[in-house]
């Protein structure tokens, strides 16, 4: 997320008094804090910082961070469906990366087309409160966490990662549908973004978006 707090507030129509402090970051990693937009109890939008990744408890193994929810699981999985029905959110972004190859991987950064160098968009996501350990036999924590949805890749993404891509939305009407619409209408947004409306803006060994945009 290379864009400023002010840019996020404008696009996602969040009042300054309903927004937490946040600064542009060249990359966001699982388990770390990132800004998301959700509806508060009074129905107004708010920008808050949550930890990336739901936590899946596993027998005899350490808890696992799950950062993405598949579109073919979100309606049927007990792990995801309650959050999809009751706690949807928008994850602001200006780019995202996918690896190609390994040892070392080449990281390809994708952005949507627009007049700006890195136009803002959102990953439709879900959030919840997690109370429990993050490590095997570790102490319990109390965190609000989020994950975002993935779907089948478009042609551009499939050239790098043939398995999945995040769902992207950039239309303000779709923001409202995801936050407040019915589950049926929200699920209609679970589609791959048009390949011709995206581009690869950077590739190489860096796992950070090297562009700094206000």
State where each predicted segment sits:
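Short linear sequence motif anchored by a di-proline
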Residues: 1-214
């Amino acid at each position: 997320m290379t864009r400023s707090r002010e840019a996020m507030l404008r696009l996602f129509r969040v009042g300054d008094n309903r927004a937490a402090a946040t600064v542009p970051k060249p990359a966001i990693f699982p388990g770390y804090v990132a800004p998301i937009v959700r509806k508060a109890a009074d129905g107004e939008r708010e920008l808050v910082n949550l930890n990336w990744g739901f936590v899946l408890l596993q027998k005899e193994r350490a808890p696992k961070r799950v950062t993405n929810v598949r579109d073919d699981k979100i309606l049927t999985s007990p792990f995801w469906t309650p959050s999809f029905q009751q706690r949807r959110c928008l994850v602001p972004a200006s780019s995202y990366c996918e690896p190609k190859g390994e040892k070392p991987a080449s990281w390809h950064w994708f952005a949507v087309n627009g007049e700006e160098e890195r136009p803002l968009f959102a990953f439709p996501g879900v959030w919840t409160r997690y109370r429990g350990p993050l490590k095997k036999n570790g102490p319990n924590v109390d965190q609000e966490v989020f994950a975002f949805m993935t779907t089948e890749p478009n042609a551009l993404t499939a050239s790098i990662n043939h398995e999945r891509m995040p769902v992207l939305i950039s239309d303000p009407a779709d923001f409202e549908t995801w936050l407040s619409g019915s589950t049926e209408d929200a699920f209609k947004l679970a589609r791959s973004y048009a390949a011709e409306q995206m581009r690869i803006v950077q590739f190489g060994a860096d796992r950070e978006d090297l562009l700094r945009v206000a």
